[in-house]
């Protein structure tokens, strides 16, 4: 397996610290609002990578944090007239609802920054003792010039970064690029007691501390959105490696943006759609399909047309599953014969191809193409003359390859199936009664819902089409 490491800017063979195990940290949301579909892509991408690692046999310890104290949260809590903790509790609950709806698996641990204040204070104290941080009027800053490799993640030296960075001017800092690891309390802000007076942690120190506490000094994979490379991830490296003297993360993975009209989707531009809004119109399968239809390091556009296309594509894949489900109930032969066993064995090439694509830096776009090739093969070769065992095993393979992508796991909608069966029986009765107008109306109504009826020797069958 090869992964693209942002740190080295090249693909590298993936070798975990402990054979068969992966320690993975993903920067999670700041819980002051519903997350938008751009954030959703990041969560879906790294959920998919986690799923695939598990599919390949790795035991994954997956940590994704909640930032539950920062300026945005303080301002939003004040606007709503509630405490910062109440705001965090509210939107963590909303996050889980939307993430569950998107089939994003729960993390092994979802730490909240406010649960690790004691550890963060200790971390800051040790940075000061090591000479990498200094206190000014209750604030504590990290001294970037003390860390030789600062800028390595984004491939720039400190001077170049200073020229291009948007940095807050504070004459108390020794260098403009120095950043806060502890912030002195301002009026009306929540605070915790510390050796430097009441205050709260800086954003970057939270992730460094929680990653170290939950995963150790060195982790296998650290991941997040492309916008976090600098300054957030750069600062995490500086803090963590200054303290431990060890490599913080062996592999850095970053997911590209989602664009609307070729501009990055963001709350600041007010061009975003929340995941919940999109889920009202589209299934999690369709949304995940769109988000994974391009390589995770390549930006994708978000449009209704592309979502509709993703919906149609997912329906094509489910059509194969639905046909196999119907065939299982209709075929008379139960067990596979020798020819069917040979055919089933021939399908292994799709599994091998799927793994080959995903092993190449998690190329979901090409892996999805393999799924379409598999279902096309099955549609052309599994029919009413096949055994129920072959139908079962073919369906199992389609679902198996869909699982790492978080798609094709739903069962046939029984309510829909029952409704259609009732309409078919009503149509049959209308034809017996020579009420052809009613029979045609039922057929046309179903057709308008992309449901086609087929007359077979075993009776009327239905299937969904694009």
From Swiss-Prot:
Reported cofactor(s): Zn(2+)
Gene Ontology cellular component list: cytosol
Binding site for Zn(2+): 27, 207, 232, 236
Main location class: cytoplasm
Domain of life: Bacteria
Cofactor binding: number and manner: Binds 1 zinc ion per subunit.
InterPro entries referenced in this protein's UniProt entry, alphabetically: Cys-tRNA-ligase, Cys-tRNA-synt_Ia_DALR, Cys-tRNA/MSH_ligase, CysS_C, Rossmann-like_a/b/a_fold, tRNA-synt_1_cat_dom, tRNAsynth_Ia_anticodon-bd
Record: residues binding ATP: 267
Catalytic activity line of the entry: tRNA(Cys) + L-cysteine + ATP = L-cysteinyl-tRNA(Cys) + AMP + diphosphate
UniProtKB keywords: Aminoacyl-tRNA synthetase, ATP-binding, Cytoplasm, Ligase, Metal-binding, Nucleotide-binding, Protein biosynthesis, Zinc
EC id: 6.1.1.16
Positions of transmembrane segments: none
GO biological process, one term: cysteinyl-tRNA aminoacylation
Motif 'HIGH' region in this chain: 29-39
Molecular function GO labels: ATP binding; cysteine-tRNA ligase activity; zinc ion binding
Record motif 'KMSKS' region, residues: 264-268
Subcellular compartments: Cytoplasm
HAMAP family the record matches: Cys_tRNA_synth
Assembly description: Monomer.
Similarity-based family: Belongs to the class-I aminoacyl-tRNA synthetase family.
Record-linked PANTHER family: CYSTEINE--TRNA LIGASE, CYTOPLASMIC, CYSTEINYL-TRNA SYNTHETASE
Protein name per Swiss-Prot or TrEMBL: Cysteine--tRNA ligase
Organism: Clostridium beijerinckii (strain ATCC 51743 / NCIMB 8052) (Clostridium acetobutylicum)
Record gene name: cysS
